[in-house]
Amino acid sequence: LLLCVGLLLVLKHHDGAAHKLVCYFTNWAFSRPGPASILPRDLDPFLCTHLVFAFASMSNNQIVPKDPQDEKILYPEFNKLKERNRGLKTLLSIGGWNFGTVRFTTMLSTFSNRERFVSSVIALLRTHGFDGLDLFFLYPGLRGSPARDRWTFVFLLEELLQAFKNEAQLTMRPRLLLSAAVSGDPHVVQKAYEARLLGRLLDFISVLSYDLHGSWEKVTGHNSPLFSLPGDPKSSAYAMNYWRQLGVPPEKLLMGLPTYGRTFHLLKASQNELRAQAVGPASPGKYTKQAGFLAYYEICCFVRRAKKRWINDQYVPYAFKGKEWVGYDDAISFGYKAFFIKREHFGGAMVWTLDLDDFRGYFCGTGPFPLVHTLNNLLVNDEFSSTPSPKFWFSTAVNSSRIGPEMPTMTRDLTTGLGILPPGGEAVATETHRKSETMTITPKGEIATPTRTPLSFGRHTAAPEGKTESPGEKPLTTVGHLAVSPGGIAVGPVRLQTGQKVTPPGRKAGVPEKVTTPSGKMTVTPDGRAETLERRL
């Protein structure tokens, strides 16, 4: 019996059956009202393989906490979760939609600026006990970022990776992890990234395969459909296969799954199907307070009074009530996406975010974190499951893993102002968070601010095997964790090809240039030309 179990574990390791489950937690989530407020201590440390804290900021080309309270309260609570799960990895993410591109561009523009940033990253991560850095740059070469940032971003990744390796050798500690969140829109991907090089330099890549449709459009569409429809190739499957066809190892690609939905205000209540005419966003949610956006726990309240429908070709649900329409994910659609990830041998899933799931189980009646638990059961804790994967019926060729990296035909032209809302409901929430200047913890362990009454989060008690539980909660069960090797990625001399240049309308694109430089000696001049510069690490 032991021999059989050992053989199964070996097969599991080699066939890629173990997956990452990377989950974001936002530093503005505590400022939401009442039962929607959450702190790091409320997270289940056994639910995800990696937890990512969003977001850090930047000042004078150095990474810094976004708010003083992050450093004093939230960072310690976040990393203390590893005391309960020794296999858990934590990362700090920098960027986001509200962060913009100007500070990234300035930092990337010279080797000395990048060197200053890299040094500050290592110091901050080690000081607070994080295991790695996540870059959430939206987007290199777009939204005011110059075209050369497509390349200087690659230079930064190479310099971060080499510095992380050097620091690990000097300190005899595991190497810091390096990841990035990238667009799932092929238009953005072609202009913003050197995909093959990102695949070499990053430990994993989170594809933002959501916000594919929303209230910025004139007809209803799903936020994150699994599969594409004729005439509309945008889907999670297409985004993942597009990145794979660009040369990124599939085991490094994580499918982004949203724990929220996008809403529309219908033109006519009687026309409520997919691609029905719409005139902007539906009403803001009670807790997230952003038009066109609902957290999953808000959706649970909405669907009780609404009519639900299933999009057969896209494997996702939507609901409508009167003139309000929402496309969202539930446990069933998350299950289909998990099976797709396994079948296509991708590296796992990324969740945006833990704090938008029904984290206490108050709203949906299916227990805490119902959506993320579905992914955990299917991707992380699926040790010896014999459950057969469902069969998918592809509606168009773009859903196939055999697609090429050519541009799909789409009706929307890409501009530097992408014409979409900030991903994941960041816009309103971050501004709210920045107003909380004097958050304190009371002697009873409650959070108090000048605009809020203290909120009690329950008294944690010791449980068997070093875990904790709160009154009324089920004991946590340890799940498998995918170990991350501290070894680095071999990076030799890098051949850089600029590929398609971004040119103004009416001008012809120049011939793609090739620049060959030894690893670690790259910089960029103000006009975008690559030159060499000796590393000073």
Curated annotation (Swiss-Prot):
Glycans are attached at N399. SUPFAM superfamilies: (Trans)glycosidases, Chitinase insertion domain. Transmembrane segments: none annotated. Keywords: Cytoplasmic vesicle, Disulfide bond, Fertilization, Glycoprotein, Signal. It comes from the Eukaryota. One of its GO terms (cellular component) is transport vesicle. Chitin binds at P68, Q69, G95, G96, W97, N98, Y139, L208, S209, Y210, D211, W352. Gene3D superfamilies: 3.10.50.10, Glycosidases (3.20.20.80). Pfam families: Glyco_hydro_18. Residues 1-18 form the signal peptide. Residues 446-475, 498-537 are annotated as: Disordered. Residues 19-382 form the GH18 domain. One of its GO terms (biological process) is chitin catabolic process. InterPro entries: Chitinase_II/V-like_cat, Chitinase_insertion_sf, Glyco_hydro18_cat, Glycoside_hydrolase_SF, Glycosyl_Hydrlase_18. Oviduct. GO terms for molecular function: chitin binding; chitinase activity. Binds to oocyte zona pellucida in vivo. May play a role in the fertilization process and/or early embryonic development. Belongs to the glycosyl hydrolase 18 family. This is Oviduct-specific glycoprotein.
